[in-house]
């Protein structure tokens, strides 16, 4: 179960589905009271950028949308609703309109070096809304480079950015007008959730009693034949994100040192953790990697179990599960899906690295309606080991660790959709993908901000 904001009676809102719960506001509001939006756009996209900012502030397009009419405020999905604080437009001189569609970096850089940006109001938190001529997955190397350069330049001014592909945005807005619909609202909903996290808020959390344990995720992304490791430091068991660090593959000592700092920082606010849980993107070397970690724990006089949960990024297709009673409704009848309930798992037996398990991670929840449009993902493989303890891991502990992987797949704050992998793997991978494109390793001072979403 997930927990969101408050209802009209001041009670916590709990829901299985992110898309429904976010309408009650964030679990933890962004800490700023004055948030202002800066538009960054090509001159041909001026009107679309204007409509986009209007939608963020007012919850509607700002122009006649076919036969569609907003009849009451409950239908408006303003950005303020998702971040928990008021939103205004930035000062006129801060908006940036560029002419070079293929390489806007020079114009954006000149604007950021101008007087307006050198004298920003320190009492205001600015967010850049970048209507990009191309997206970060662009095939052209130079286009991709531009995307990341602009993101880094704004971060140097402590301004997180939310990007949207210009062509996709225009196509969706056009369809909405032609069909008198508001489907673009779902894109805005995802963007609102991401902006909340970029501003240090938590759109939703896990409905779990807080435990004295530390969860650290280590993931990787390979770019240009070099492998980078990004480590998301760290989470508590409710999903609260605390910190992150970034390393190259060869910097194992730095990685262990960062885990040490995460433990010390955690212990300075809470009691010492009762256990350390590491979600790892690959099999861990007992001799080369875990030994350094064990030595560090000994140095801290911390005699706690360390559970290594290896999470295979590739969905399992050689071994799958079926549920004969699993169905879903089509337009005409009831069809079999064969997909087990989300969170179900089975034991695949023991290997040299530990015990292997198969976890179903989808959107079929008990006592909830399943939508075929959510897809039918294959389960994922996990391996669980506790290298610094002898004997088998208790079944109850295994259940807790597997359920934690499943639950951490539900606090992905870039979308209201359930993910196949936990954020302990996805977030580090995202950091590792972005950082090689940045000139500086240190680009943002607020470590509680998920600026990379």
Where are these regions (language model features)?
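Long, charge-dense tracts
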Residues: 9, 18-145
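Long, contiguous domain-sized segments
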Residues: 71, 78, 93-104, 109-123, ...
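Flexible inter-domain linker/hinge segments
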Residues: 1-31, 178-205
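Aromatic-residue detector
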Residues: 13-23, 27-31, 43-45, 60, ...
């Amino acid at each position: 179960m997930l927990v969101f904001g408050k209802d009209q009676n001041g009670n916590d809102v709990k829901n299985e589905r992110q898309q429904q719960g976010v309408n009650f506001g964030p679990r933890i509001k962004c800490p700023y009271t004055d948030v202002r939006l800066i538009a960054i756009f090509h001159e041909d996209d001026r009107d679309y950028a204007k409509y986009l900012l209007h939608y963020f502030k007012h919850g509607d397009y700002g122009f006649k949308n076919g036969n569609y009419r907003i009849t009451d405020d409950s239908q408006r999905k303003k950005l303020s609703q998702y971040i928990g604080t008021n939103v205004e437009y930035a000062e006129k001189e801060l908006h940036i309109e560029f002419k070079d569609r293929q390489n806007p970096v020079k114009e954006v850089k000149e604007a950021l070096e101008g007087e307006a940006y050198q004298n920003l109001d320190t009492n205001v938190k600015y967010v850049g809304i970048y209507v990009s001529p191309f997206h970060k997955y662009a095939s052209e190397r130079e286009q991709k480079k531009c995307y990341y350069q602009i993101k880094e330049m704004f971060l140097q001014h402590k301004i997180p950015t939310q990007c949207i592909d210009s062509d996709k945005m225009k196509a969706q807005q056009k369809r909405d007008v032609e069909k008198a619909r508001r489907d673009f609202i779902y894109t805005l909903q995802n963007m609102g959730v991401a902006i909340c996290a970029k501003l240090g808020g938590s759109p939703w959390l896990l409905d779990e009693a807080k435990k004295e344990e530390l969860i650290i995720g280590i993931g990787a992304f390979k770019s240009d034949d070099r492998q980078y490791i990004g480590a998301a430091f760290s989470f508590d068991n409710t999903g609260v994100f605390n910190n992150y660090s970034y390393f190259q593959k060869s910097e194992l000592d730095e990685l262990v040192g960062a885990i040490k700092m995460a433990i010390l920082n955690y212990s300075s606010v809470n009691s010492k953790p009762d256990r350390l849980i590491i979600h790892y993107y690959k099999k861990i070397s007992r001799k080369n990697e875990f030994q350094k970690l064990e030595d560090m724990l000994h140095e801290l006089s911390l005699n706690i179990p360390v559970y290594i949960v290896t999470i295979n990024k590739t969905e399992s297709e050689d071994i799958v599960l079926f549920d004969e009673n699993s169905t879903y409704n089509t337009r005409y009848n009831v069809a079999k899906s064969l997909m087990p309930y989300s969170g179900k798992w089975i034991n695949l037996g023991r290997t040299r690295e530990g015990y292997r398990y198969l976890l179903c991670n989808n959107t079929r929840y008990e006592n909830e309606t399943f939508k075929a449009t959510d897809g039918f993902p294959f389960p994922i493989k996990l391996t669980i080991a506790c290298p610094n303890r002898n004997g088998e891991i208790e079944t109850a502990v295994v259940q807790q660790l597997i359920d934690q992987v499943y639950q951490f797949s539900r606090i992905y704050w870039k979308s209201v959709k359930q993910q196949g992998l936990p954020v302990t793997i996805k977030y580090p991978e995202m950091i590792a993908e972005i950082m090689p494109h940045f000139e500086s390793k240190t680009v943002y001072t607020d470590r509680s901000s998920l600026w990379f979403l």
